[in-house]
Amino acid sequence: MAARQLRRLSLPTHLPLPIRPHVRHLGTAQTNCHRFDHETDILIVGSGAAGLTAALRSHFHGLSSLVIEKDAQIGGTSAYSGGGLWIPNNPLAVEAGIIDTPEQAMTYLISVIDADTAEDTDVRRASSPPRKRAFLTHGPHMVSFLRDRGFAFRLSPGCPDYYPQAHGALPTGGRSIEPDVFDARLLGLGEKWTEAIRQRPGRSLPLFTYEASSVTRMGASWRDVGTVLRVLLRGIYLSRVRGQIPVTMGKSLVAQLLWLHMQLDQGPVLTDTALRQLIATPEGVILGARVATPDGERSIRARCGVLLCAGGFAHNQGLRERYGPVPANAEWTSAARGDNGDAIVAGVRVGAATALMDEAWWGPTLRDPVRGMYYFALQERARPFGVIVDSSGKRFMNEAEPYTDAGHHQYAQKAVPAWFVFDWNHRKRYAVGSLMPRQQPPAQALDAGYIHRADTIAELARQIGVNEKGLEGTLARFNEMADCGVDSDFARGESAFDNYFGDPTVRPNPNLGAVRTPPFYAIPLVPGDLGTKGGLLTDEHARVIREDGTPVQGLYAAGNTTASVMGRTYPGAGATLGPAMTFAFIAIDHIASEHV
């Protein structure tokens, strides 16, 4: 595929793709009412991991597909992510001898998703038993399908389920996988591949997710320094010795899927092409969509169906304020800029039901002291020598708990912002965002209030407007518990998930360390997210459904465009992308069963 195919492309004004003899289309009577500029079997809205997976599966079934992307670059939030997939009983785990079954995984999902949700209609509809079973059944097949075509995955060793003490959990890992390192030269774009796939600012190393915890605590032990050296040497060897452009995580995920897409000659991904509205018959059958291109609006006929997988509404301030908890700020999200709810709004306009619109993949988020951008604080808060407090100076959560739970607790406590308070022991051992161990905070970060520093706790409390006596009392109690290694208040450090992001050199509890060594630091934390998790209701076939449970014929959805099968929880690393790609896979299989 030439570089120009990934840039601004207009749609042809003719119908270049004939209706294939083996495909039953929706009938010419309905289409006579509409003039279409382009035809395809399946229109896929969104070029993230779900959309590209759907395109590959379409080709497998002999169906043509057209992927449209509103932004100039492809990949969406998938390209920003760690690239992990949570897929119970996945083939890599089976090959590694890890014991898991669909029944055990179902027990786990029921334990963590359905607890205390008897009155929660949204969870019961979004995470129905048939949808859970569909995910668990088809997830391993989706992974095998991609591997058979050349996609390189690897296990994320030791990454536990996020609720390792729940029934059915795998405390030592096995359900999370991620992309292997990929040579972006294979895309044929040279150094310009960065113009095709969405990038975060700054240069990245070929780092795997399971190495990140060690790399960011490089000041704690020589073993962690060794991990840093291994990553650096990997990058030097692959780039300078072998002449590769090595990428990992979300960039590898999207790049590998794009590369496979290119091998099949499925046609280009049309960038700068935004969904405007779905086109339906008077009876509500979806015929295609109206889209905006650099050359004006065009209509696309989707003979077999439309798949919406264009993300959620993380950057839509109006929708966030309408549906979600407040205060809300679209700037706090880690999702891609184009994540503004277009696909969800389009679905609602043709009768789709919604659920979980008040939810997101929450997590405490800070302003990076070096780069100034919002940063999802995954590891910093789990480390010893720090606490999170509200304005009264009181702790209100297990700081190392799963991030979506932490976001829920922050809103429940009305702690917006909350404050992450830590000392020099934390500062000299661990990175905080892009601020490396022992690195002094930039003056502009101190001036802007991204980070605060003081020689005493009392002075720090006055700087950040937190109750002085409350904070001193909290730290006195916390330090006693840290010395004993037992958090009697919130059980921090008692689960394998907590320990995964802790510091194994700190004993007796790798997540607890007293906050008593000056200087002291504080960083404001807001309830950011990795994207929203509410959206269109879908069934076990990924069909979009109405309030009465009937499907909107010809309309499918996957990923953050839908109400998540994970309900209000986050069961394990990759619980966003795993279901997104699986339900995109399911959608295409169902379309094929209806039309091929």
From Swiss-Prot:
Induction: Expression is under the control of the secondary metabolism regulator laeA.
Keyword Flavoprotein: yes
Function, in words: 3-ketosteroid 1-dehydrogenase; part of the gene cluster that mediates the biosynthesis of helvolic acid, an antibacterial nortriterpenoid. Protostadienol synthase helA cyclizes (3S)-oxidosqualene to (17Z)-protosta-17(20),24-dien-3-beta-ol (protostadienol). The synthesis of protostadienol is followed by several steps of monooxygenation, dehydrogenation, and acyl transfer to yield the final helvolic acid.
Protein name: 3-ketosteroid 1-dehydrogenase helE
Annotated family: Belongs to the FAD-dependent oxidoreductase 2 family. 3-oxosteroid dehydrogenase subfamily.
Species lineage: Eukaryota, Fungi, Dikarya, Ascomycota, Pezizomycotina
Enzyme class: oxidoreductase
GO CC terms of this entry: cytoplasm
Cofactors required: FAD
UniProt: FAD binding residues: 28-31, 46-47, 53-55, 410-411
Keywords attached to this entry: FAD, Flavoprotein, Oxidoreductase
Pfam families: FAD_binding_2
GO term, biological process aspect, one: secondary metabolic process
EC number: 1.3.-.-
Gene coding for it: helE
InterPro entries: FAD-dep_OxRdtase_2_FAD-bd, FAD-oxidoreductase_2, FAD/NAD-bd_sf, Succ_DH/fumarate_Rdtase_cat_sf
Pathway(s) annotated for this protein in UniProt: Mycotoxin biosynthesis
GO molecular function terms listed in the Swiss-Prot or TrEMBL record: oxidoreductase activity
